[in-house]
Design a protein with these regions (language model features):
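Active-site loop/oxyanion-hole signature of alpha/beta-hydrolase fold enzymes
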Residues: 34, 67-110, 114
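Conserved alpha/beta-hydrolase catalytic His-Asp/Glu region
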Residues: 145, 149-150, 166-223
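Flexible "cap/lid" loop of the alpha/beta hydrolase fold
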Residues: 124, 131-168
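Post-His helix in hydrolase/transferase enzymes
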Residues: 274-286
Length: 289
Protein backbone atom coordinates (compact mmCIF):
# COMPACT_ATOMS: atom_id res chain seq x y z
CA UNK A 1 0.00 0.00 0.00
CA UNK A 2 1.32 3.42 -0.86
CA UNK A 3 1.72 5.75 2.10
CA UNK A 4 0.56 8.72 0.00
CA UNK A 5 -2.95 7.23 0.00
CA UNK A 6 -3.26 7.43 3.76
CA UNK A 7 -4.21 11.11 3.73
CA UNK A 8 -7.32 10.31 1.71
CA UNK A 9 -8.37 7.55 4.13
CA UNK A 10 -8.36 9.35 7.47
CA UNK A 11 -10.88 7.87 9.87
CA UNK A 12 -12.85 9.78 12.49
CA UNK A 13 -12.99 7.49 15.53
CA UNK A 14 -15.67 7.45 18.17
CA UNK A 15 -14.89 5.18 21.11
CA UNK A 16 -17.12 3.69 23.79
CA UNK A 17 -14.83 2.80 26.69
CA UNK A 18 -15.86 1.04 29.91
CA UNK A 19 -13.93 0.03 33.01
CA UNK A 20 -14.88 -3.67 32.71
CA UNK A 21 -15.31 -5.97 29.72
CA UNK A 22 -16.82 -3.83 26.98
CA UNK A 23 -16.80 -3.02 23.30
CA UNK A 24 -14.97 -0.12 21.69
CA UNK A 25 -16.17 0.68 18.20
CA UNK A 26 -14.80 2.57 15.20
CA UNK A 27 -15.67 2.27 11.53
CA UNK A 28 -12.60 0.07 10.93
CA UNK A 29 -12.43 -2.17 13.98
CA UNK A 30 -14.40 -3.35 16.98
CA UNK A 31 -12.44 -4.06 20.16
CA UNK A 32 -13.72 -6.31 22.93
CA UNK A 33 -11.96 -5.95 26.29
CA UNK A 34 -11.60 -8.90 28.68
CA UNK A 35 -9.67 -9.48 31.88
CA UNK A 36 -7.41 -7.42 34.13
CA UNK A 37 -3.68 -6.80 34.15
CA UNK A 38 -1.05 -5.69 31.63
CA UNK A 39 -2.50 -4.87 28.21
CA UNK A 40 -2.32 -7.31 25.29
CA UNK A 41 -3.79 -6.69 21.82
CA UNK A 42 -4.94 -9.64 19.70
CA UNK A 43 -5.32 -9.14 15.93
CA UNK A 44 -6.93 -11.88 13.78
CA UNK A 45 -6.04 -12.66 10.18
CA UNK A 46 -7.68 -12.33 6.79
CA UNK A 47 -11.38 -13.25 6.80
CA UNK A 48 -11.11 -14.33 10.44
CA UNK A 49 -13.15 -13.63 13.52
CA UNK A 50 -11.97 -12.25 16.83
CA UNK A 51 -13.27 -15.59 18.12
CA UNK A 52 -10.07 -17.18 16.82
CA UNK A 53 -8.62 -15.89 20.11
CA UNK A 54 -11.31 -17.37 22.39
CA UNK A 55 -9.10 -20.10 23.85
CA UNK A 56 -6.19 -17.67 24.17
CA UNK A 57 -8.41 -15.15 25.94
CA UNK A 58 -9.72 -17.76 28.37
CA UNK A 59 -6.14 -18.78 29.10
CA UNK A 60 -4.91 -15.22 29.73
CA UNK A 61 -7.79 -13.15 31.08
CA UNK A 62 -7.05 -13.77 34.77
CA UNK A 63 -3.63 -12.17 34.39
CA UNK A 64 -3.89 -9.75 31.45
CA UNK A 65 -6.31 -7.18 30.06
CA UNK A 66 -7.01 -8.33 26.52
CA UNK A 67 -8.06 -6.05 23.67
CA UNK A 68 -9.49 -8.40 21.05
CA UNK A 69 -9.82 -6.82 17.64
CA UNK A 70 -12.43 -7.57 14.98
CA UNK A 71 -11.71 -6.08 11.56
CA UNK A 72 -14.73 -4.58 9.79
CA UNK A 73 -15.89 -6.77 6.91
CA UNK A 74 -14.43 -10.02 8.24
CA UNK A 75 -16.44 -12.92 9.70
CA UNK A 76 -19.82 -11.22 9.37
CA UNK A 77 -18.79 -7.88 10.86
CA UNK A 78 -20.31 -5.01 8.82
CA UNK A 79 -17.76 -3.62 6.30
CA UNK A 80 -18.36 0.02 7.28
CA UNK A 81 -15.38 2.13 6.13
CA UNK A 82 -13.65 -0.98 4.74
CA UNK A 83 -16.39 -1.25 2.11
CA UNK A 84 -14.30 0.82 -0.31
CA UNK A 85 -10.67 1.56 -1.13
CA UNK A 86 -7.81 0.27 1.00
CA UNK A 87 -8.15 -1.84 4.13
CA UNK A 88 -4.83 -2.63 5.80
CA UNK A 89 -3.23 0.77 6.44
CA UNK A 90 -6.44 2.42 7.67
CA UNK A 91 -6.94 -0.54 10.02
CA UNK A 92 -3.42 -0.10 11.38
CA UNK A 93 -4.22 3.59 11.83
CA UNK A 94 -7.39 2.67 13.74
CA UNK A 95 -5.44 0.35 16.05
CA UNK A 96 -2.91 3.11 16.72
CA UNK A 97 -5.75 5.53 17.48
CA UNK A 98 -7.33 2.99 19.84
CA UNK A 99 -4.07 2.55 21.73
CA UNK A 100 -3.54 6.30 22.08
CA UNK A 101 -7.18 7.16 22.84
CA UNK A 102 -7.27 4.61 25.65
CA UNK A 103 -3.79 5.54 26.87
CA UNK A 104 -2.43 2.02 26.68
CA UNK A 105 1.23 1.95 27.63
CA UNK A 106 3.21 -0.07 25.08
CA UNK A 107 0.94 -3.13 25.12
CA UNK A 108 2.13 -6.47 23.85
CA UNK A 109 0.64 -7.29 20.44
CA UNK A 110 -0.15 -10.74 19.01
CA UNK A 111 -1.20 -10.97 15.37
CA UNK A 112 -2.06 -13.96 13.21
CA UNK A 113 -1.46 -13.99 9.45
CA UNK A 114 -2.65 -10.62 8.11
CA UNK A 115 -2.85 -9.56 11.76
CA UNK A 116 0.85 -10.34 12.07
CA UNK A 117 1.61 -8.12 9.10
CA UNK A 118 -0.46 -5.33 10.65
CA UNK A 119 1.35 -5.84 13.95
CA UNK A 120 4.66 -5.39 12.16
CA UNK A 121 3.41 -2.24 10.45
CA UNK A 122 2.22 -0.87 13.78
CA UNK A 123 5.60 -1.64 15.38
CA UNK A 124 7.69 0.25 12.84
CA UNK A 125 5.25 3.11 12.22
CA UNK A 126 4.43 3.66 15.90
CA UNK A 127 7.17 2.05 18.01
CA UNK A 128 5.73 3.63 21.14
CA UNK A 129 2.58 1.51 20.67
CA UNK A 130 4.20 -1.91 20.92
CA UNK A 131 6.03 -3.29 23.96
CA UNK A 132 6.51 -6.68 22.35
CA UNK A 133 5.25 -8.40 19.23
CA UNK A 134 4.28 -11.99 18.48
CA UNK A 135 3.75 -12.76 14.79
CA UNK A 136 1.86 -15.99 14.14
CA UNK A 137 2.46 -17.72 10.79
CA UNK A 138 2.91 -14.54 8.82
CA UNK A 139 5.56 -13.02 6.59
CA UNK A 140 6.69 -9.40 6.12
CA UNK A 141 6.12 -9.93 2.39
CA UNK A 142 3.44 -12.46 1.47
CA UNK A 143 4.57 -12.33 -2.14
CA UNK A 144 7.53 -14.49 -1.07
CA UNK A 145 5.08 -17.39 -0.81
CA UNK A 146 4.61 -17.08 -4.57
CA UNK A 147 8.32 -16.85 -5.32
CA UNK A 148 8.24 -13.08 -5.88
CA UNK A 149 11.30 -11.02 -5.02
CA UNK A 150 9.46 -7.72 -4.64
CA UNK A 151 5.92 -6.28 -4.89
CA UNK A 152 6.24 -5.43 -8.58
CA UNK A 153 6.84 -9.09 -9.38
CA UNK A 154 3.67 -10.26 -7.66
CA UNK A 155 1.27 -7.50 -8.79
CA UNK A 156 0.01 -9.38 -11.89
CA UNK A 157 -0.81 -12.49 -9.86
CA UNK A 158 -2.29 -10.49 -6.98
CA UNK A 159 -4.46 -8.53 -9.42
CA UNK A 160 -5.70 -11.70 -11.09
CA UNK A 161 -6.51 -13.34 -7.75
CA UNK A 162 -8.34 -10.24 -6.50
CA UNK A 163 -10.38 -9.86 -9.67
CA UNK A 164 -11.22 -13.56 -9.78
CA UNK A 165 -12.47 -13.41 -6.21
CA UNK A 166 -14.56 -10.32 -6.91
CA UNK A 167 -16.13 -11.99 -9.95
CA UNK A 168 -17.29 -15.06 -8.03
CA UNK A 169 -20.91 -15.51 -7.11
CA UNK A 170 -21.56 -15.79 -3.39
CA UNK A 171 -22.18 -19.53 -3.80
CA UNK A 172 -18.90 -20.03 -5.64
CA UNK A 173 -17.10 -17.92 -3.07
CA UNK A 174 -18.49 -20.08 -0.25
CA UNK A 175 -17.50 -23.31 -2.04
CA UNK A 176 -13.99 -22.08 -2.76
CA UNK A 177 -13.45 -20.83 0.77
CA UNK A 178 -14.68 -24.13 2.16
CA UNK A 179 -12.15 -26.02 0.05
CA UNK A 180 -9.34 -23.55 0.77
CA UNK A 181 -9.77 -23.70 4.54
CA UNK A 182 -8.97 -27.41 4.51
CA UNK A 183 -5.39 -26.41 3.73
CA UNK A 184 -5.26 -23.80 6.50
CA UNK A 185 -6.74 -25.62 9.51
CA UNK A 186 -5.86 -29.25 10.20
CA UNK A 187 -8.22 -29.97 13.09
CA UNK A 188 -11.80 -30.73 11.97
CA UNK A 189 -13.33 -28.34 14.50
CA UNK A 190 -10.82 -25.62 13.66
CA UNK A 191 -11.47 -26.03 9.96
CA UNK A 192 -15.20 -25.79 10.55
CA UNK A 193 -14.76 -22.55 12.51
CA UNK A 194 -12.36 -20.97 10.02
CA UNK A 195 -14.66 -21.88 7.14
CA UNK A 196 -17.65 -20.31 8.86
CA UNK A 197 -15.73 -17.06 9.38
CA UNK A 198 -14.41 -16.94 5.83
CA UNK A 199 -17.79 -17.61 4.22
CA UNK A 200 -19.40 -14.92 6.39
CA UNK A 201 -16.75 -12.36 5.38
CA UNK A 202 -17.48 -9.61 2.88
CA UNK A 203 -16.05 -10.80 -0.44
CA UNK A 204 -14.96 -7.34 -1.55
CA UNK A 205 -13.15 -6.57 1.70
CA UNK A 206 -11.39 -9.94 1.58
CA UNK A 207 -10.35 -9.49 -2.06
CA UNK A 208 -8.90 -6.03 -1.54
CA UNK A 209 -7.17 -6.93 1.72
CA UNK A 210 -5.67 -10.03 0.09
CA UNK A 211 -4.30 -7.92 -2.77
CA UNK A 212 -2.85 -5.39 -0.34
CA UNK A 213 -1.24 -8.12 1.78
CA UNK A 214 0.35 -9.75 -1.26
CA UNK A 215 1.79 -6.45 -2.52
CA UNK A 216 2.92 -4.98 0.81
CA UNK A 217 6.58 -5.46 1.68
CA UNK A 218 7.78 -4.28 5.08
CA UNK A 219 11.15 -6.07 4.93
CA UNK A 220 13.04 -2.82 4.22
CA UNK A 221 11.61 -1.39 7.46
CA UNK A 222 12.14 -4.35 9.78
CA UNK A 223 15.37 -2.83 11.09
CA UNK A 224 13.27 -0.06 12.64
CA UNK A 225 11.50 -2.51 14.95
CA UNK A 226 13.54 -2.55 18.16
CA UNK A 227 10.99 -4.25 20.42
CA UNK A 228 11.40 -8.01 21.01
CA UNK A 229 9.58 -10.08 18.38
CA UNK A 230 8.60 -13.75 18.56
CA UNK A 231 7.70 -15.36 15.25
CA UNK A 232 5.78 -18.63 15.26
CA UNK A 233 5.47 -20.56 12.03
CA UNK A 234 3.60 -23.76 11.33
CA UNK A 235 4.86 -26.87 9.62
CA UNK A 236 3.23 -30.18 8.79
CA UNK A 237 4.33 -32.89 6.40
CA UNK A 238 0.80 -33.01 4.99
CA UNK A 239 1.27 -29.58 3.42
CA UNK A 240 3.82 -31.05 1.03
CA UNK A 241 6.34 -28.33 1.91
CA UNK A 242 9.67 -29.78 3.09
CA UNK A 243 10.82 -28.63 6.50
CA UNK A 244 14.10 -27.71 4.82
CA UNK A 245 12.20 -25.14 2.75
CA UNK A 246 9.90 -23.85 5.48
CA UNK A 247 12.52 -22.80 8.03
CA UNK A 248 14.67 -20.74 5.63
CA UNK A 249 11.58 -18.94 4.33
CA UNK A 250 11.10 -17.31 7.72
CA UNK A 251 14.78 -16.89 8.52
CA UNK A 252 15.48 -15.14 5.22
CA UNK A 253 12.42 -12.90 5.17
CA UNK A 254 12.92 -11.75 8.77
CA UNK A 255 16.71 -11.47 8.47
CA UNK A 256 16.71 -7.68 8.98
CA UNK A 257 14.69 -7.87 12.20
CA UNK A 258 17.21 -7.18 14.99
CA UNK A 259 15.59 -8.62 18.12
CA UNK A 260 13.76 -11.78 17.12
CA UNK A 261 13.10 -15.38 18.05
CA UNK A 262 11.72 -17.76 15.42
CA UNK A 263 9.90 -20.87 16.64
CA UNK A 264 8.51 -23.64 14.45
CA UNK A 265 5.30 -25.36 15.59
CA UNK A 266 5.11 -28.86 14.12
CA UNK A 267 1.98 -30.83 13.21
CA UNK A 268 0.01 -27.69 12.45
CA UNK A 269 -1.41 -25.88 9.47
CA UNK A 270 -1.80 -22.09 9.31
CA UNK A 271 -4.21 -21.73 12.27
CA UNK A 272 -1.73 -22.76 14.97
CA UNK A 273 -4.00 -21.67 17.81
CA UNK A 274 -6.72 -24.03 16.53
CA UNK A 275 -4.52 -26.95 15.47
CA UNK A 276 -2.06 -26.96 18.38
CA UNK A 277 -3.73 -24.99 21.20
CA UNK A 278 -1.48 -26.31 23.98
CA UNK A 279 1.76 -25.61 22.10
CA UNK A 280 0.43 -22.20 21.14
CA UNK A 281 -0.57 -21.32 24.71
CA UNK A 282 2.87 -22.36 25.96
CA UNK A 283 4.60 -20.05 23.47
CA UNK A 284 2.26 -17.18 24.36
CA UNK A 285 3.12 -17.67 28.04
CA UNK A 286 6.84 -17.49 27.25
CA UNK A 287 6.30 -14.37 25.14
CA UNK A 288 4.34 -12.60 27.88
CA UNK A 289 6.76 -13.36 30.72
Amino acid sequence: MKNKLIAFLTVALTWQVYTAAADAVSNRITVTVRGHGPDVLLIPGLASSSAVWDATASHLENHFRLHIIQVAGFAGAPPQANAQATVIQPTVDAIDAYIKTNRLQAPRVIGHSLGGLMGGMLAYQHPEDVGGLMIVDSLPFFGALFGAKDPAAVIPQATAMRDQLLAQTQDDYAKNQTAFMRSLAKSPDGCKQATKWAVASDKSVVARAMYEAMTTDIRPRLHKIKTPVTILHAWDSLTGIPQAASDPLYQENYAALPNKKIVRIDDSFHFIMLDQPDKFAAQVDIFLK
